[in-house]
Amino acid sequence: MRINPTTSGSGVSTLEKKNPGRVVQIIGPVLDVAFPPGKMPNIYNALVVQGRDSVGQPINVACEVQQLLGNNRVRAVAMSATDGLTRGMEVIDTGAPISVPVGGATLGRIFNVLGEPVDNLGPVDTSTTSPIHRSAPAFIQLDTKLSIFETGIKVVDLLAPYRRGGKIGLFGGAGVGKTVLIMELINNIAKAHGGVSVFGGVGERTREGNDLYMEMKESGVINEENIAESKVALVYGQMNEPPGARMRVGLTALTMAEYFRDVNEQDVLLFIDNIFRFVQAGSEVSALLGRMPSAVGYQPTLSTEMGSLQERITSTKEGSITSIQAVYVPADDLTDPAPATTFAHLDATTVLSRGLAAKGIYPAVDPLDSTSTMLQPRIVGEEHYETAQRVKQTLQRYKELQDIIAILGLDELSEEDRLLVARARKIERFLSQPFFVAEVFTGSPGKYVGLAETIRGFQLILSGELDGLPEQAFYLVGNIDEATAKAMNLEMESNLKK
């Protein structure tokens, strides 16, 4: 943790014992601290408990002030384990909120909630820090233009386009390709937009965080040889950490992303996995602070906490933060206050389907379940909108016919329906795409497909011009020209076999 939120601070060593307090009560991760009269810290100030435990090991626990109790006492939430703390230990008020390192030096590194590196690669080579608590950009600073954020992934750009500076909910179970999709987006924004990414692991499994780091190194998203050329900074607050850390780790990641947007004037991708855990941690802290619970046991400040995080994720005249948030839905109940509050902030939803993953169609994005508020003719244009609607209609009709096909077979369908089914199967396969980050295990070179190329390809399939090509020619290709070339190769191979 950096104490001084300026470009000159040199970390915790700058602590001065000008305003010491004493621990008077410890209840799990919550501490009550007494300060001298007239020396009370502000809400959100970082406190540091220093001392030695019963076996002489040094203790250095950072806390954040949450309540002023009266009688010169404050209640603070610890950001790390409170094991070994005792009443009477000295507490120092740092005079500022938790501040974390920001800038290019954070790329390729893993941090905890306090901005301390946890990857055993030494200290972070920067003195620039920023406080994790700040206001959302003023209305006059916002960029209100509605523009599409091109990802180079066909199914996303055509059917559920992302808004530049928007928020996208990513829904998917285990093993359907969520991590690979996240890594491809990180890779594509770096190549096409010259942007960077920040990944906030909020209350996730330590194993998953480790897997993601290893996969990013394998795929080149994190460059081990030259760490400065990496495209992503990772911030983790895992499941085993106290609720204070899980509640604030999202703000740490967001603070790093804001610096890239506001100072470096870049487009930034911010991943939060999982936004539900942010709410869950807030609920735990709220109960520990003695607040009256609200609906379903959630904190009464749920909407305020969510709003203060989400409103900072936006486009300004300098750059944009586009956020992709994994959303866990407890017991599949979309009316639960946690997902319901999240939905109010989302511009698009990307739903990953286990059925498509089972067919081997990757990315396994469900074209009918995924939605976007950007898919309107006045925003994307008539051509894009019409093509997307026709693709959805074709796939919906194919879905309706599948029961008949399963019972009676294709031959019982009318000529018109048989043609529609053939085109729908081509569309389904053409929605698949080889990924750059998956090259290591598929052997197929990755493809970035521009939006204009994507629209042209689907228009050709819908018009019937490609009815004569086999459907396997459309599987795992980039643009439509590759599909026609693949069809010719398949034909040549079959002729040689004869």
Swiss-Prot record:
Q: Which SMART domains match?
A: AAA
- Pfam families reported in the protein's UniProt record: ATP-synt_ab, ATP-synt_ab_N, ATP-synt_VA_C
Does the keyword section mention Transit peptide? no
What's a Gene Ontology MF term here? ATP binding
The annotated topology with respect to the bilayer is: Peripheral membrane protein
BP GO terms, sorted: proton motive force-driven mitochondrial ATP synthesis
> Where does this protein chiefly localize?
plastid
- Key word Chaperone present: no
Q: Which reaction(s) does its UniProt entry say it catalyses?
A: ATP + H2O + 4 H(+)(in) = ADP + phosphate + 5 H(+)(out)
Q: Which family does it belong to?
A: Belongs to the ATPase alpha/beta chains family.
Quaternary assembly: F-type ATPases have 2 components, CF(1) - the catalytic core - and CF(0) - the membrane proton channel. CF(1) has five subunits: alpha(3), beta(3), gamma(1), delta(1), epsilon(1). CF(0) has four main subunits: a(1), b(1), b'(1) and c(9-12).
Q: What is this protein called?
A: ATP synthase subunit beta, chloroplastic
| Gene from which this protein is expressed | atpB
